[in-house]
């Protein structure tokens, strides 16, 4: 037959019921609370004790009692964390909240600043490691010296190579300069030849034009002279023709009687 889960009005009622059940079974509930729990319960209005998890008890048994210390500062931190948690959580959540706070308190107490006593094997291991340190230091120093020598050698080789590289660079630059100069000279020669041709063509055109002008002038002069001569000839011919006609007329009159 399944038992229905009881509902509790508060965490205190649930805790009291749990303690009663444990006592009825003949078991004594283990409780491990610190001052922080009591202060918290008093402030919240709860009374009684809360069972701690058995895992924490197991950790307490494993570690020596010298390592566990109480820190009042941790108590205040846990209280501030508890106060920041929301109040609307149910009773089960509040129980988990208290358990998580007790676990934080426990871990804080366990990992204290007090050193744990070492056993014989650990001491032997530490002594052996101290013996190894000089050899490791020697190995590192040898490596550093070898790297320093190698770097010095590389620098020396670079310096040796540097003048040769400088010479090669200067030769390359000189050849480039020569090439540029030759290209410039070729361009200048081409430009000069083009200019020369242009000037020659211009001179020829001027010469031809002047010759043409001269020829035209000469032609014009000849034409004028020839025209004048022709006019003179025509005049002479006319005059001669007129004289003949008069003679002929006189002849005709005398002989023919006209």
From Swiss-Prot:
Signal peptide, first to last residue? none
Would you say which domain of life the source belongs to?
Answer: Eukaryota
Composition bias of kind Basic and acidic residues appears in 162-175, 183-213, 220-232
Region: Disordered; residue ranges are 142-258
Q: Which UniProt keywords apply?
A: Coiled coil
Under PANTHER family, the record lists:
LYSINE-RICH COILED-COIL PROTEIN 1
Name it.
Answer: Lysine-rich coiled-coil protein 1
Q: Which organism is it from?
A: Pongo abelii
């Amino acid at each position: 037959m399944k038992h229905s889960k009881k509902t509790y009005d508060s965490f205190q009622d649930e805790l009291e019921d749990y303690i009663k059940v444990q006592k009825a079974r003949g078991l004594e509930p283990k409780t491990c609370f610190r001052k922080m729990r009591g202060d918290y319960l008093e402030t919240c209005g709860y009374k009684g004790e809360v069972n701690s998890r058995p895992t924490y008890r197991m950790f307490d048994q494993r570690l020596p009692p010298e390592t566990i210390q109480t820190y009042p500062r941790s108590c205040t931190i846990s209280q501030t964390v508890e106060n920041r948690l929301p109040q609307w959580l149910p009773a089960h959540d509040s129980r988990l909240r208290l358990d998580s706070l007790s676990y934080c308190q426990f871990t804080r107490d366990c990992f204290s600043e007090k050193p744990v006593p070492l056993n014989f094997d650990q001491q032997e291991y530490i002594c052996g490691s101290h013996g190894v340190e000089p050899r490791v230091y020697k190995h590192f120093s040898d490596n550093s010296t070898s790297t320093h020598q190698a770097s010095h050698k590389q620098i020396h080789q670079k310096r040796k190579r540097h003048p040769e590289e400088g010479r090669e660079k200067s030769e390359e630059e000189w050849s480039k300069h020569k090439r540029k100069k030759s290209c410039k000279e070729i361009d200048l020669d081409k430009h000069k030849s083009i200019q020369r041709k242009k000037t020659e063509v211009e001179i020829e055109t001027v010469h031809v034009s002047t010759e043409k002008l001269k020829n035209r002038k000469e032609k014009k002069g000849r034409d004028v002279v020839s025209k004048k001569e022709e006019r003179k000839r025509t005049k002479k011919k006319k005059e001669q023709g007129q004289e003949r006609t008069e003679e002929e007329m006189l002849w005709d009159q005398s002989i023919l009687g006209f």
